[in-house]
A protein has these predicted regions:
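Glycine-rich, proline-tolerant flexible connector loops at the mouths of alpha/beta enzymes
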Residues: 45-46, 69-82
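N-terminal glycine-rich anion-binding loop in soluble enzyme alpha/beta folds
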Residues: 1-60, 279-281
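Acidic (Asp/Glu)-rich catalytic clusters
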Residues: 58-64, 92-95, 154-159, 227-230, ...
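A C-terminal functional module that forms or caps the active site or interfaces directly
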Residues: 217-264, 268-275
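Conserved, mostly hydrophobic/aromatic
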Residues: 18, 68, 103, 139, ...
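C-terminal helical cap(s) of enzyme catalytic domains, especially alpha/beta-barrels
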Residues: 250-256, 271-308
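Glycine-enriched alpha-helix->loop->beta-strand junction motifs that scaffold or abut catalytic
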Residues: 65, 134-137, 158-164, 207, ...
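Conserved anion-binding
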Residues: 108-211
């Protein structure tokens, strides 16, 4: 799957991923009204609004982008209907030939990680039949439990030709409480980065490993160090736009070939119509605002890489 991601990034010229992280406050009133009219002000109604919101954004942007990243918590909050909306979103994005990064941040003891990996990246056998539960192409993984929590995911990736993005240095302000702690004079995130490179060497695609890393845009100097530690790992870069990251801050996350990183923007794209720069589109044309935000993001990052 890493080969497909790289191929689509080259084809679109867009090293970006749209984070499908819907909150009800992002969804235009006309979509909410229609969903509530059909299902009431219920979990089912909220999930229907989320699904229709996602569908419009995907319809307006899929030809510009290589991938989407639905954050599962935004669906879990609506219970079973929300999870059904998550699955519908994944399936619809697949129908548009998008790469799907399941932002699930899983990680547990071996048997539990194996179940998580099966659910999100693999297949499950039920009697004589086999099913694909969610069917994402990549999953985000928390490595805090160590190798026996990560290896089950790697095993499924090898079997299914899927991929991982392992949390290394996250974009949130308090990430340094643990990730920056020194061990033998070196920050923990560097040691995790070395482990990602080691895991990644086991399963290489044509140019890059199936095993990538999450490194926040808000820490560009750390990203520069980690790029050198993990030269064959794709880096998923959250924190662009709404969290403060800009194209010029991101150049060190990329290799000299202009590849090696994919930058995420969530509310900066899906709620673009709420921003002053895109207010002219209005709530009725929120999908067009999202498309314009994608085009601006591509131009920003491409311009920064060209000037590197």
């Amino acid at each position: 799957m890493i080969n497909k991601l790289v191929e689509k990034i080259k084809k679109t010229g867009a090293p970006i991923v749209v984070g499908l992280d819907p909150m009800l406050s992002y969804i235009p009133q006309h979509i909410l009204d229609k969903a509530y009219a059909e299902y009431g002000e219920t979990l089912e109604g909220a999930a229907e609004a989320v699904w229709q919101f996602n569908k419009e954004i995907v319809d307006k942007t899929y030809d510009l982008i290589p991938a989407v990243k639905p954050q599962i918590a935004m669906y879990e909050q609506f219970g079973i209907p929300g999870m059904e909306a998550f699955k519908k979103t994944v399936d619809y994005c697949k129908s548009k030939d998008l790469v799907i990064i399941g932002d699930v941040k899983r990680g547990d003891i071996g048997s539990t990680s194996a179940a998580y990996a099966t659910g999100h990246l693999g297949k499950i056998k039920v009697g004589s039949k086999e099913y694909v539960p969610f069917g994402e192409d990549f999953a985000t993984v928390n490595p805090y439990l160590g190798s026996d929590g990560v290896n089950p995911f790697i095993d499924v990736c090898k079997e299914e030709k899927k991929g991982l993005f392992i949390l290394v240095k996250t974009s949130n302000p308090s990430s340094g409480e643990f990730q920056d702690r020194l061990i033998d004079g070196r920050p923990l995130y560097e040691l995790v980065g070395e482990k990602v490179a080691e895991w990644g060497a086991e399963c290489m695609g044509d140019e890059y490993s199936y095993i990538g890393a999450v490194v926040g845009a808000t820490y560009p100097e750390m990203g520069k160090v980690l790029r050198k530690i993990m030269p064959k790992s794709y880096i998923l870069v959250p924190g662009y736009g709404a969290q403060g990251g800009k194209g010029k801050d991101l150049v060190h996350f990329f290799n000299e070939d202009g590849l090696g990183a994919i930058v995420n923007s969530s509310r900066g794209i899906i709620a673009a119509y709420k921003q002053e720069a895109y207010a002219k589109f209005g709530a009725e044309n929120f999908g067009d605002a999202s498309r314009a935000a994608v085009e601006a993001m591509i131009a920003d990052i491409s311009g920064a890489l060209a000037a590197k």
